[in-house]
Each structure stands twice: as structure tokens, then as C-alpha cells.
Amino acid sequence: MKHMIRLLALLLCLISLTSTALAYPAGFLVYHGDREQKRIAITVDDIYDADVLRMMHDLSLELDFPITYFVLGAQIRDTDKEVWESIIANGGEIGNHTWKHPYLTEITKHNARNQILLTQERIDELLGYHYPLRLLRPPFGKFTQELLNLFDEYGVQKTVMWDVSYTDPQEAFKATENGSILLFHTNYVDYHCLVELIPMLQEAGYELVTVSELIGMEPLQTSEEKYVFPYR
């Protein structure tokens, strides 16, 4: 009887752990879109260099393709408000890349939460309205099941990874397939890669869309009331 009780207790423990580990919704973690559709998404992380940000945005306007930017809250400057407004107005989108790019797996749950929410507050402060950062890319691509649950708890709808990460246009082109999410950063090497790569992708028949379009999300709903970080 004692043996049976121990087995039942172990089973209940395993069920509880599994339930906790998989608390986030199915499809919450994304590496690519539909492999049956010739659509891809260009993503740019960090935004350390505002000059390169402007160059990439100008390129997206010139070649008529959208970019999904995963921003660091600490790098959002008031002087860049105009370019962010233009990005949104011209079909681009903004996702969360945390406040200062830490290894989220090496900080406390509360600090990880703050990294997410402070960035939401900063983007709302810049734009003057609530722009939900429903996409998140964890720095270095590092996460745990617990962190995925945390992202879900604090308003993230999709954790977005990638399946192509090359700074050489030929290598990036060869690695790209239907549904690919391509990763770049705001530096001159990546900018010049995009200058060559985008026409190649377009000539190959790829439709370039935002990440949210690629994975079939509903249009973003903004609102007047800005988010204010409540944990100071």
C-alpha cells in the first residue's frame, strides 16, 4: 500500500510539473512560418546604431518590403521618434528584445519581468500611445520553459526565433526557404548584406512580410492609454 501511495504521489508530481512547463499556448514559440507558402520575414535586432536603423528603413522603403524590429528599450531615443513612426506607418512592426540584452536565463524571474515591461513602457512613452509589444525575441536566443511561461504571463503572444542567420548574401539566400525568418542587426555589414540580398529574394519570388503576417496573427490593436511600469 505504501508503495502504491508513493507511486501515486510521484505521478501527481509529474503531472503538476508537466502542466507548469507547458502553461504557455501551443504555437507560442516560433522558428519559421508556413513551409508551404513562399513568404518570409526580415527581422533586425538590438538597434544600437540609429544611423544604420535609418539606412535600413530607407532601404525598406526603396525596395518595398517591411522589417520587424526587435528593440532594446534602453536604446530607444527620443530623437528617433520620427523614424519609428515612419516604420509603423509604412507597414513595419516592433517587437520586444528586453531592456538591456541580458542572458535572461541567468537573472531572476523578477528582473526578467522588468526587462520586458520597461521596454513596453519606453516604446509607449516614445510613441505617445499604447503599442503592444506582442512579439518577443529573447537575447542570444536563450530561454527556458519557465521564461516562456513568464513571457506569456506578461502579454507576449509569440516568442520569435529564426532559422536563417548569415551576413553573407549568397549564404543567406541559399539558406532561405518558404516561411523563413531571417535575423540581422543594425550594423554596416548586415545593411550591405540586405542591399544585395533583398533583390535576390524578390526576384526568386518570395513575398516579404512582417513576422506577425508570416505566422497569421490578427492586425495589431493599439490604444490611447500608455502602459506604465508598476513595479518601481
Residue ranges and their predicted role:
Residues E225-R232:
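Structured C-terminal subdomain patch of bacterial secreted/periplasmic proteins
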Residues M1-L7:
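Positively charged n-region of N-terminal signal peptides that target proteins for export
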Residues I5, A21-A26:
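N-terminal entry module detector
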